[in-house]
Amino acid sequence: IRELWKGYLRVVNSFKKIISEIKDEGLYKVERPISSPQSIDIVTDKGLNVLNFCANNYLGLANHPDLIASAKQALDEYGFGMASVRFICGTQTIHKELEDTISQFFNSDDTILYSSCFDANGGLFETLLGQNDAIISDSLNHASIIDGIRLCKAQRYRYKNNDMDDLEEQLINSQNAEIRLIATDGVFSMDGYIANLDLITTLAKKYDAIVMVDDSHATGFIGKTGRGSAEYHNVMDKIDIWTSTLGKALGGASGGFTTGRKEFIDLLRQRSRPYLFSNTLTPAITSAGIKAFKMLSKSTELRDKLDKNTKYFRREISGLGFEIKNGEHPIIPIMTYDALIAQKVASALLKEGIYVIGFFYPVVPKNEARIRVQISAGMSLSHLDQALDAFKKVGEKFNII
């Protein structure tokens, strides 16, 4: 018992040292609870009323009454949970309906649901690829893609972010592989850049590779009808596999999916470990997901409102003198470069009633610190102007503008 106790203390002291180093480097993350539903107008646990400019709530559906009503109805009709994985007794008719609805939205063959997009990516690569195959991955892909690749025995190649010359070089280097899969985010979440899927699919055809896109920051609002980054580039028919989420624009609860060619989805149902060994998506989330997709299939009103809001804020924030990353996406990185300044600006903006977060190394490269603003269709013009006024005041205070 004494030796076990010594071992425990050694582990605890080691972890304390790591936490201390994280704090000393200014990288310690602090959660700021809110006491209201997720929306544009939120209330912090301190009772402060603020405008939320940092949520993935792109279409303003997180607290939409139609989704809430759909979830409540599903609770009454289908119950709270399934207490099972899909292949035992965890598949209800609404799970198949949501999969069919997603397939229709993407015009794909079939769809498989997961607890999250992280799980969808985690269960993708090791299922489809083996040691004689190769993955060519963008250097700025999401952590879930990186972790999913780590679980796979395939050869690994990486190309510079959105760099088509480097991608082609890696495709040439990997020509000994039997199957080659190009993996990319549809939108890179720290910069708001949309992947060059038109050029990626051209290279994939040239070198006989398949293409996988994680469209979590695009599904529902990028492209003229919100079908995502592939629609934006007019290459919907050239993507083999999409992964995405219900946890951002589509209500923001949880749940992910993989959609694409039938043979890929069939194999995932048989062998994808996160799918086989995780509980089924809850009926309430499933039903609300169906409702969200049907809303977006009927009208582009929310997507169009988001586009209008994004263009307005990008134009006005640049006009104030702030440096932002160029683009069209509602992710708008406002550059401070200095990590400490980013944190101070975020704190000052909170006092002005604007809830944003500073991002810095290791989330972004060193000396690339920023405030990441995320625009929503739920924002009114007065919301946007209030934020712009606050940014102007704080920007002048810290000599950013």
Regions found by a protein language model. Give the residues of each.
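Short, structured coil segments at secondary-structure junctions
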Residues: 131, 151-153, 207, 238
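Active-site phosphate-binding strand-loop segment of PLP-dependent enzymes
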Residues: 57, 157, 161-213
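Short loop-beta-helix segment that forms the pyridoxal 5′-phosphate
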Residues: 85-91, 99-123
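Conserved PLP-binding catalytic core of the aspartate aminotransferase-like
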Residues: 61, 305-313, 318-353, 363, ...
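Conserved PLP-anchoring active-site segment centered on the Schiff-base-forming lysine
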Residues: 124-143
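Active-site C-terminal subdomain of aminotransferase-like
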Residues: 207-210, 217, 222-328, 341
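PLP-dependent enzyme catalytic core of the Aspartate aminotransferase-like
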Residues: 6-7, 65, 69-73, 77, ...
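N-terminal "arm"/small-domain region of PLP-dependent enzymes with the aminotransferase-like
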Residues: 13-17, 21-78, 209
